[in-house]
Protein backbone atom coordinates (compact mmCIF):
# COMPACT_ATOMS: atom_id res chain seq x y z
CA UNK A 1 0.00 0.00 0.00
CA UNK A 2 1.13 3.55 -0.68
CA UNK A 3 0.31 6.36 1.70
CA UNK A 4 1.20 9.98 1.12
CA UNK A 5 0.93 12.97 3.47
CA UNK A 6 -0.71 16.09 2.11
CA UNK A 7 -1.21 19.78 2.86
CA UNK A 8 -4.90 19.51 3.71
CA UNK A 9 -8.29 18.49 2.45
CA UNK A 10 -8.41 20.41 -0.83
CA UNK A 11 -4.88 19.32 -1.71
CA UNK A 12 -5.79 15.67 -1.16
CA UNK A 13 -8.81 15.78 -3.45
CA UNK A 14 -6.99 17.62 -6.22
CA UNK A 15 -3.98 15.33 -6.15
CA UNK A 16 -6.03 12.17 -6.36
CA UNK A 17 -8.83 13.18 -8.71
CA UNK A 18 -6.84 15.45 -11.03
CA UNK A 19 -3.82 13.17 -10.86
CA UNK A 20 -5.80 10.10 -11.91
CA UNK A 21 -7.80 11.94 -14.58
CA UNK A 22 -4.68 13.36 -16.22
CA UNK A 23 -2.87 10.02 -15.99
CA UNK A 24 -5.71 8.12 -17.68
CA UNK A 25 -6.89 10.70 -20.19
CA UNK A 26 -5.55 8.58 -23.02
CA UNK A 27 -7.84 5.72 -21.95
CA UNK A 28 -11.04 7.70 -21.42
CA UNK A 29 -12.49 10.98 -20.23
CA UNK A 30 -15.59 10.05 -18.20
CA UNK A 31 -15.93 10.34 -14.41
CA UNK A 32 -18.87 9.33 -12.22
CA UNK A 33 -19.70 11.10 -8.96
CA UNK A 34 -22.72 12.13 -6.87
CA UNK A 35 -24.60 15.38 -6.38
CA UNK A 36 -23.71 15.53 -2.68
CA UNK A 37 -19.91 15.51 -2.81
CA UNK A 38 -17.77 17.98 -0.86
CA UNK A 39 -17.33 21.34 -2.68
CA UNK A 40 -13.59 20.68 -3.05
CA UNK A 41 -14.40 17.53 -5.02
CA UNK A 42 -17.11 19.15 -7.13
CA UNK A 43 -14.96 22.17 -7.98
CA UNK A 44 -12.10 19.88 -8.97
CA UNK A 45 -14.47 18.03 -11.29
CA UNK A 46 -15.80 21.30 -12.72
CA UNK A 47 -12.21 22.25 -13.54
CA UNK A 48 -11.67 18.91 -15.29
CA UNK A 49 -14.78 19.59 -17.36
CA UNK A 50 -12.96 22.61 -18.81
CA UNK A 51 -10.32 20.13 -20.01
CA UNK A 52 -12.96 18.15 -21.95
CA UNK A 53 -13.64 15.54 -19.28
CA UNK A 54 -17.27 14.41 -19.00
CA UNK A 55 -18.74 14.10 -15.50
CA UNK A 56 -21.96 12.31 -14.54
CA UNK A 57 -23.50 13.60 -11.29
CA UNK A 58 -25.69 10.88 -9.81
CA UNK A 59 -28.72 11.83 -7.69
CA UNK A 60 -29.47 10.60 -4.21
CA UNK A 61 -32.96 9.70 -3.10
CA UNK A 62 -35.08 10.62 -0.08
CA UNK A 63 -32.78 8.58 2.16
CA UNK A 64 -29.74 10.51 0.91
CA UNK A 65 -28.07 7.42 -0.55
CA UNK A 66 -26.69 6.72 -4.03
CA UNK A 67 -28.06 3.60 -5.69
CA UNK A 68 -25.47 1.10 -6.89
CA UNK A 69 -27.71 0.40 -9.88
CA UNK A 70 -27.44 4.06 -10.92
CA UNK A 71 -23.65 3.81 -10.81
CA UNK A 72 -23.80 0.69 -12.96
CA UNK A 73 -26.08 2.36 -15.51
CA UNK A 74 -23.81 5.42 -15.72
CA UNK A 75 -20.69 3.47 -16.70
CA UNK A 76 -19.54 3.89 -20.30
CA UNK A 77 -16.54 2.56 -22.24
CA UNK A 78 -14.89 5.94 -21.51
CA UNK A 79 -15.30 5.77 -17.71
CA UNK A 80 -11.92 5.99 -15.96
CA UNK A 81 -12.87 6.97 -12.41
CA UNK A 82 -15.72 6.73 -9.91
CA UNK A 83 -15.59 9.03 -6.88
CA UNK A 84 -18.30 8.74 -4.20
CA UNK A 85 -17.96 10.02 -0.63
CA UNK A 86 -18.11 7.45 2.19
CA UNK A 87 -20.11 9.61 4.61
CA UNK A 88 -21.87 12.90 3.98
CA UNK A 89 -20.86 15.84 6.15
CA UNK A 90 -24.28 17.54 6.01
CA UNK A 91 -26.92 14.88 6.48
CA UNK A 92 -24.66 12.09 7.73
CA UNK A 93 -25.67 9.30 5.38
CA UNK A 94 -23.27 6.44 4.65
CA UNK A 95 -22.94 5.31 1.05
CA UNK A 96 -22.68 1.66 -0.14
CA UNK A 97 -18.97 2.05 -0.85
CA UNK A 98 -18.04 -1.65 -0.68
CA UNK A 99 -20.71 -2.53 -3.25
CA UNK A 100 -19.74 0.32 -5.57
CA UNK A 101 -16.09 -0.67 -5.17
CA UNK A 102 -16.88 -4.26 -6.10
CA UNK A 103 -18.66 -3.05 -9.23
CA UNK A 104 -15.72 -0.81 -10.13
CA UNK A 105 -13.28 -3.72 -9.72
CA UNK A 106 -15.40 -5.91 -11.98
CA UNK A 107 -15.40 -3.19 -14.64
CA UNK A 108 -11.70 -2.38 -14.12
CA UNK A 109 -12.46 1.24 -13.22
CA UNK A 110 -10.51 3.08 -10.52
CA UNK A 111 -12.55 3.98 -7.44
CA UNK A 112 -11.92 6.87 -5.05
CA UNK A 113 -13.80 7.60 -1.83
CA UNK A 114 -13.70 10.62 0.43
CA UNK A 115 -13.44 9.13 3.94
CA UNK A 116 -12.79 12.45 5.66
CA UNK A 117 -16.06 12.35 7.61
CA UNK A 118 -16.02 8.64 8.46
CA UNK A 119 -12.40 8.08 9.49
CA UNK A 120 -12.22 7.92 13.28
CA UNK A 121 -16.01 7.57 13.55
CA UNK A 122 -16.62 4.19 11.91
CA UNK A 123 -14.32 1.40 10.75
CA UNK A 124 -12.52 2.33 7.55
CA UNK A 125 -10.71 -0.57 5.87
CA UNK A 126 -9.52 -0.05 2.29
CA UNK A 127 -9.66 -3.79 1.56
CA UNK A 128 -13.24 -4.18 2.79
CA UNK A 129 -14.32 -1.02 0.97
CA UNK A 130 -12.74 -2.16 -2.33
CA UNK A 131 -11.19 1.26 -2.99
CA UNK A 132 -8.15 2.22 -5.03
CA UNK A 133 -7.83 5.72 -3.60
CA UNK A 134 -9.01 7.19 -0.30
CA UNK A 135 -8.81 10.69 1.23
CA UNK A 136 -8.32 11.63 4.89
CA UNK A 137 -7.96 14.91 6.80
CA UNK A 138 -6.19 15.43 10.11
CA UNK A 139 -8.49 18.00 11.70
CA UNK A 140 -11.44 15.61 11.57
CA UNK A 141 -9.73 13.42 14.18
CA UNK A 142 -8.53 16.41 16.23
CA UNK A 143 -5.08 16.42 14.64
CA UNK A 144 -3.22 19.48 13.31
CA UNK A 145 -5.06 21.60 10.76
CA UNK A 146 -3.76 21.83 7.22
CA UNK A 147 -2.63 18.19 7.10
CA UNK A 148 -4.20 15.39 5.08
CA UNK A 149 -3.36 11.97 3.74
CA UNK A 150 -4.21 9.92 0.72
CA UNK A 151 -4.19 6.18 0.27
CA UNK A 152 -3.17 4.95 -3.16
CA UNK A 153 -3.44 1.24 -3.85
CA UNK A 154 -0.16 -0.38 -4.81
CA UNK A 155 0.23 -0.32 -8.57
CA UNK A 156 -2.00 2.71 -9.12
CA UNK A 157 -0.14 5.64 -10.64
CA UNK A 158 -1.18 9.30 -10.66
CA UNK A 159 0.22 12.32 -12.45
CA UNK A 160 1.94 14.65 -9.93
CA UNK A 161 0.58 18.19 -9.82
CA UNK A 162 3.63 19.70 -8.10
CA UNK A 163 7.08 19.05 -9.54
CA UNK A 164 10.45 19.52 -7.94
CA UNK A 165 12.58 17.48 -5.58
CA UNK A 166 10.67 14.24 -5.95
CA UNK A 167 9.53 13.87 -2.35
CA UNK A 168 6.85 11.32 -1.49
CA UNK A 169 8.01 9.02 -4.30
CA UNK A 170 7.49 11.80 -6.81
CA UNK A 171 3.79 12.17 -6.00
CA UNK A 172 4.18 15.58 -4.37
CA UNK A 173 7.43 17.49 -4.38
CA UNK A 174 8.21 19.97 -1.63
CA UNK A 175 9.49 19.97 1.93
CA UNK A 176 7.36 17.69 4.07
CA UNK A 177 5.50 19.01 7.12
CA UNK A 178 7.08 16.64 9.64
CA UNK A 179 5.39 18.06 12.80
CA UNK A 180 2.02 17.94 11.06
CA UNK A 181 2.56 14.38 9.89
CA UNK A 182 3.62 13.22 13.35
CA UNK A 183 0.66 14.99 14.95
CA UNK A 184 -1.73 13.44 12.46
CA UNK A 185 -0.25 10.01 13.14
CA UNK A 186 -0.76 10.41 16.89
CA UNK A 187 -4.33 11.62 16.38
CA UNK A 188 -5.02 8.53 14.24
CA UNK A 189 -3.60 6.28 16.94
CA UNK A 190 -5.83 7.81 19.63
CA UNK A 191 -8.92 7.74 17.40
CA UNK A 192 -8.35 4.09 16.50
CA UNK A 193 -7.78 3.03 20.11
CA UNK A 194 -11.07 4.61 21.21
CA UNK A 195 -13.10 3.82 18.09
CA UNK A 196 -15.46 1.17 19.42
CA UNK A 197 -16.09 2.96 22.72
CA UNK A 198 -16.76 6.30 21.03
CA UNK A 199 -18.95 4.72 18.36
CA UNK A 200 -21.22 3.04 20.91
CA UNK A 201 -21.52 6.23 22.96
CA UNK A 202 -22.26 8.43 19.96
CA UNK A 203 -24.82 6.06 18.45
CA UNK A 204 -26.70 5.90 21.75
CA UNK A 205 -26.76 9.69 22.05
CA UNK A 206 -27.64 10.15 18.37
CA UNK A 207 -30.60 7.78 18.51
CA UNK A 208 -31.91 9.35 21.72
CA UNK A 209 -31.81 12.83 20.17
CA UNK A 210 -33.55 11.67 17.00
CA UNK A 211 -36.31 9.90 18.91
CA UNK A 212 -36.94 12.76 21.33
CA UNK A 213 -36.95 15.49 18.68
CA UNK A 214 -39.28 13.63 16.33
CA UNK A 215 -41.64 12.81 19.19
CA UNK A 216 -41.65 16.24 20.82
CA UNK A 217 -41.46 18.72 17.93
CA UNK A 218 -44.44 19.03 15.56
CA UNK A 219 -43.66 18.92 11.84
CA UNK A 220 -40.07 17.81 12.42
CA UNK A 221 -38.33 15.51 9.96
CA UNK A 222 -35.04 13.61 9.92
CA UNK A 223 -33.05 14.17 6.73
CA UNK A 224 -31.37 11.04 5.43
CA UNK A 225 -31.58 7.37 6.31
CA UNK A 226 -32.27 6.59 9.96
CA UNK A 227 -29.82 3.69 10.22
CA UNK A 228 -27.21 4.08 7.46
CA UNK A 229 -25.64 7.19 8.94
CA UNK A 230 -22.65 8.48 10.83
CA UNK A 231 -22.86 8.20 14.61
CA UNK A 232 -22.10 11.90 15.08
CA UNK A 233 -24.22 13.68 12.45
CA UNK A 234 -27.95 14.41 12.62
CA UNK A 235 -29.82 16.69 10.23
CA UNK A 236 -33.38 17.81 10.92
CA UNK A 237 -35.74 20.10 9.11
CA UNK A 238 -38.58 21.90 10.86
CA UNK A 239 -41.68 23.23 9.12
CA UNK A 240 -43.14 24.93 12.17
CA UNK A 241 -40.42 27.48 13.01
CA UNK A 242 -38.10 29.90 11.23
CA UNK A 243 -34.45 28.85 11.34
CA UNK A 244 -32.92 31.92 12.96
CA UNK A 245 -35.59 31.95 15.66
CA UNK A 246 -34.71 28.37 16.53
CA UNK A 247 -31.01 29.24 16.72
CA UNK A 248 -31.70 32.08 19.15
CA UNK A 249 -33.87 29.83 21.30
CA UNK A 250 -31.20 27.12 21.45
CA UNK A 251 -28.50 29.68 22.22
CA UNK A 252 -30.54 30.94 25.17
CA UNK A 253 -30.64 27.36 26.45
CA UNK A 254 -26.87 26.96 26.17
CA UNK A 255 -26.72 24.98 22.91
CA UNK A 256 -24.50 25.86 19.95
CA UNK A 257 -26.33 25.48 16.66
CA UNK A 258 -26.29 26.79 13.10
CA UNK A 259 -28.55 26.79 10.07
CA UNK A 260 -25.58 26.30 7.73
CA UNK A 261 -22.01 25.02 7.59
CA UNK A 262 -19.23 27.32 8.78
CA UNK A 263 -17.86 28.01 5.30
CA UNK A 264 -21.18 28.47 3.46
CA UNK A 265 -23.98 30.97 3.07
CA UNK A 266 -27.30 30.44 4.88
CA UNK A 267 -28.82 29.03 1.67
CA UNK A 268 -29.53 25.26 1.64
CA UNK A 269 -26.57 23.18 0.45
CA UNK A 270 -26.62 20.76 -2.48
CA UNK A 271 -26.62 17.70 -0.23
CA UNK A 272 -29.73 18.79 1.60
CA UNK A 273 -31.53 19.88 -1.54
CA UNK A 274 -30.69 16.56 -3.22
Protein language model annotation of sequence segments:
Residues 1-9, 13, 263-274:
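Single conserved hydrophobic/aromatic residue that forms the stacking wall/gate
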Residues 19-42, 54-59:
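Conserved PLP-anchoring active-site segment centered on the Schiff-base-forming lysine
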Residues 51-52, 106-107, 253:
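Helix C-cap/helix->beta junction micro-motif
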Residues 56, 60-120:
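Active-site phosphate-binding strand-loop segment of PLP-dependent enzymes
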Residues 129-186:
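Active-site PLP attachment segment
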Residues 193-246, 252:
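Conserved PLP-dependent catalytic core of the aminotransferase class-I/II
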Residues 252, 259-265:
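A C-terminal functional module that forms or caps the active site or interfaces directly
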